[in-house]
C-alpha cells in the first residue's frame, strides 16, 4: 500500500516537473519509522535506503527487498519506482493484509450467495414434495374419491363393458 502511494507521488511529481509548475505543497519523505511531511518549494522525491529486519509472522520469516532509486541529483533525469517484494521461506510471495481482507470479504459474500441459493432451492423442493406426497394434497384427495367411485355398486355397473350390460339385460 505504501509502495502504491509512493508510486502515485512519483507520477504526480513527474507531471508537475513536466509542466514546470512549482507548488507550495508539503513534500513526502519516507522515514524509517513513519511517513513525515516536509514543506518544500520544489517537488522531488527524496530516496532513502531502508533496511528492514526479517519479521516473523505465524512462524514464517518474511524478507523485504527494496530497490534503491537514483540519487537526488539524478532524480531530475530519471525517477525509477521503489518496489517492495515480500517473500516467505516457503518460496511463495506473501499477500498483503489489505488483499487478504478483500479476499475474505469476497469469500464471505460468495458464501452468503451460495447459502441463499441453497435455501431457496430447499424451499422449492419442500413445497413440491409436500404437494405431491401430503395427505391433503389434491392428487391424494382425487385418488381417494376415485377409489370410492370404483368401489360403489352403481359405479361398477357403469364401468362394465357395454356387451356385458346388454348380455345381462337380454339373458333370461
From Swiss-Prot:
One GO term describing the cellular component: TIM23 mitochondrial import inner membrane translocase complex
Function of the molecule: Participates in the translocation of transit peptide-containing proteins across the mitochondrial inner membrane. Also required for assembly of mitochondrial respiratory chain complex I and complex IV as component of the MITRAC (mitochondrial translation regulation assembly intermediate of cytochrome c oxidase complex) complex. Probably shuttles between the presequence translocase and respiratory-chain assembly intermediates in a process that promotes incorporation of early nuclear-encoded subunits into these complexes.
InterPro entries, sorted: Tim21
Keywords assigned by UniProt, alphabetized: Membrane, Mitochondrion, Protein transport, Transit peptide, Translocation, Transmembrane, Transmembrane helix, Transport
Pfam families xref list: TIM21 (PF08294)
Main location class: mitochondrion
Transcription regulation recorded as keyword: no
Region annotation (Disordered) ranges: 68-98
Compartments (UniProt record): Mitochondrion membrane
Species: Pongo abelii
Family membership: Belongs to the TIM21 family.
Transit peptide (first-last residue): 1-18
Topology versus the membrane: Single-pass membrane protein
Subunit relationships: Component of the TIM23 complex. Component of the MITRAC (mitochondrial translation regulation assembly intermediate of cytochrome c oxidase complex) complex, the core components of this complex being COA3/MITRAC12 and COX14. Interacts with COA3 and MT-CO1/COX1.
Gene: TIMM21
Name the record gives this protein: Mitochondrial import inner membrane translocase subunit Tim21
Transmembrane segments: 108-128
Amino acid at each position: 500500500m505504501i509502495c502504491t502511494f509512493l508510486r502515485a507521488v512519483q507520477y504526480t511529481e513527474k507531471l508537475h516537473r513536466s509542466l514546470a509548475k512549482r507548488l507550495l505543497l508539503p513534500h513526502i519523505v519516507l522515514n524509517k519509522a513513519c511517513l513525515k511531511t516536509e514543506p518544500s518549494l520544489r517537488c522531488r522525491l527524496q530516496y532513502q535506503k531502508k533496511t528492514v529486519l526479517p519479521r516473523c509472522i505465524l512462524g514464517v520469516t518474511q524478507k523485504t527487498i527494496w530497490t534503491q532509486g537514483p540519487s537526488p541529483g539524478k532524480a531530475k533525469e530519471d525517477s525509477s519506482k521503489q518496489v517492495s517484494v515480500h517473500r516467505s521461506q516457503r518460496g511463495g510471495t506473501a499477500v498483503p493484509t489489505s488483499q487478504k481482507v478483500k479476499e475474505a470479504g469476497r469469500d464471505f459474500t460468495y458464501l452468503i450467495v451460495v447459502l441463499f441459493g441453497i435455501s431457496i432451492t430447499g424451499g422449492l423442493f419442500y413445497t413440491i414434495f409436500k404437494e405431491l406426497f401430503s395427505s391433503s394434497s389434491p392428487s391424494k384427495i382425487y385418488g381417494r374419491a376415485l377409489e370410492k367411485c370404483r368401489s360403489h355398486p352403481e359405479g361398477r355397473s357403469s364401468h362394465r363393458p357395454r356387451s356385458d350390460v346388454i348380455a345381462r339385460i337380454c339373458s333370461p
